[in-house]
């Protein structure tokens, strides 16, 4: 019986995983350089964790079921609720706290380019700081990660402020601006006529036209005040905070920063600043997204903890790296293939241990194949050197070493090799 891989899921073979692990490690190293520390949490959570604040659409996309104890549980569709659950479970965490995580997440969506039902997601969050400095650091970390992956100049970051949008919508006459956020989030995906019909349920015709005009274009931060001139004072106060954040963020990256009032993010827990990054061609879905969610902690404790963060999925990053010819990995370690043809079955093990202990890679021949077959195999798995230990070499404490790149071959004293392996 043939059992096929499930739709929307991926297999990752060794060559692919080497590259994937390399770019994940670069993300980790970048976060650590900013002072962020790694956390982890279960892949399975209570369904209530997502019903409370993530929004109806996300709940409908979960891989959920009733467990043997009668509890409704789900494979985690995102990391933020679990992270906040962890944060609020302890009182000894010093603020501001900087955390990152790299879980697998699951959503029952229709698979398409850059979207799968299971993917690896890098998350970074800062807790206990509500300031333009904190917002800029988070956006700056996201940008630095992309730059360190070799993508500098290949993306731009679109920024908005949910509080700002709420104030604008109230100024335009909406009594329930938060209800319009899911609609605005689909602005670029909807037919304009259908979009306006939906707006007219909350706004009059003139206000709908004004809002569509605001959403149509990405604008420079210096043009925001002119664009929003005449709106309430509260609007202009939020604009000032955005300008302060932009001024700081621009010191982290040379990539283009835009104000895009259509960016509100789909999840209902976002509060202040929100942002997304896209490739400059505009052909791919969002590379990353994030924002501020200062009120999410209230679901767990009677206290608001300022929080801001972002997430990067591995699927879109893979597409972008491939399009820029960056989907490759060169291991800097030397790879040795060690063959023991002596009468002593353990003669090669010390050499294997010494190679591995030096930080390099040692692979042992375990099938006792013909030498020509061994050489072809060693070359196929990208080994740099072949080491042969036979009775003749062993009697004089020597070994034969062959450079598989140049095909040069020589005998070498075993002790000399061990003592100079990294020279």
Swiss-Prot record:
Residue intervals passing through the bilayer: none
Query: What is the source species?
Result: Picrophilus torridus (strain ATCC 700027 / DSM 9790 / JCM 10055 / NBRC 100828 / KAW 2/3)
Biological process annotations from GO: histidyl-tRNA aminoacylation
The protein's name? Histidine--tRNA ligase
* Keyword set, alphabetical order: Aminoacyl-tRNA synthetase, ATP-binding, Cytoplasm, Ligase, Nucleotide-binding, Protein biosynthesis
Q: Name one Pfam family in it.
A: tRNA-synt_His
EC number(s): the record gives 6.1.1.21
Family according to the record? Belongs to the class-II aminoacyl-tRNA synthetase family.
Q: Which HAMAP family match?
A: His_tRNA_synth
Predominant place of localization: cytoplasm
Subcellular location per UniProt equals: Cytoplasm
- Example GO molecular function: histidine-tRNA ligase activity
Q: What is this enzyme's catalytic activity, as reactions?
A: tRNA(His) + L-histidine + ATP = L-histidyl-tRNA(His) + AMP + diphosphate + H(+)
- GO terms under cellular component: cytoplasm
Q: Which SUPFAM superfamilies match?
A: Class II aaRS ABD-related, Class II aaRS and biotin synthetases
InterPro entries listed in its UniProt record: aa-tRNA-synth_II, aa-tRNA-synth_II/BPL/LPL, Anticodon-bd, Anticodon-bd_dom_sf, His-tRNA-ligase, HisRS-like_core, HisRS/HisZ
Query: Which NCBIfam families does the record cross-reference, listed alphabetically?
Result: hisS
